[in-house]
């Protein structure tokens, strides 16, 4: 009964993923559908990509839906970068496609064509910007509704698969540019690591990400158990007992509490959790303002966290 919505751009990674899913569909009982997003950015090249994907899907007899967006216009309207706007519209496209499938949410999977080097690039990018454990294991083979069927494959293996199966694909010219940070990591930094440090750097980083993911999952579970003791009046009241927990559990619990109250994760950072922890050492009556209309205040017995 499951439906797999495959995000296909027409590039080498997504074409290998689509071919693998098409082959698996013969053995496993699921419905395969393709989602292609036209971002309205690259003019005739984007039109070419759309036609290519539509033609392949007709040839392989896979239903395909194209969603068109004016990303430059939306980027100006939303006051966001085009990269962030692109992520938002792609997420919306999958949501729109899922809505017309007539299935329960639990029966729908979204397949993304991230590969082993993508994972390594993301780790490096997040590490250089500053991150916690979560930012070092953001790409997982299966993560809720998201699946990444080719995360275990290197770009060399993907190239071999394309050649062996005689699968055509297209090249996105923006991937060749060094304008974006991720492309500079891809073209220069990761190859240098593999040439001058370890030839299997990307593979080893993928293995490390898997171990970090296990640690992240355990810490999240433990902090969730701790957090449940301090829920009160549509917020949280952290007494002395909370502040005797290991500090990493305190941080993870505060992270979950604030995400729950805010209803989102974006713009919540380590500095906010640290401020709440510091508040416990301050005098009664002190308070701090937090994103999304949240507030933490110190009273006689602890720290209260709630929405204003």
Question: What spans do the regions from the language model cover?
Answer:
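Core alpha/beta nucleotide-donor-binding catalytic domains of modification enzymes
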Residues: 1-188
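AMP-forming adenylation/ATP pyrophosphatase catalytic core
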Residues: 1-13, 31-37, 69, 89, ...
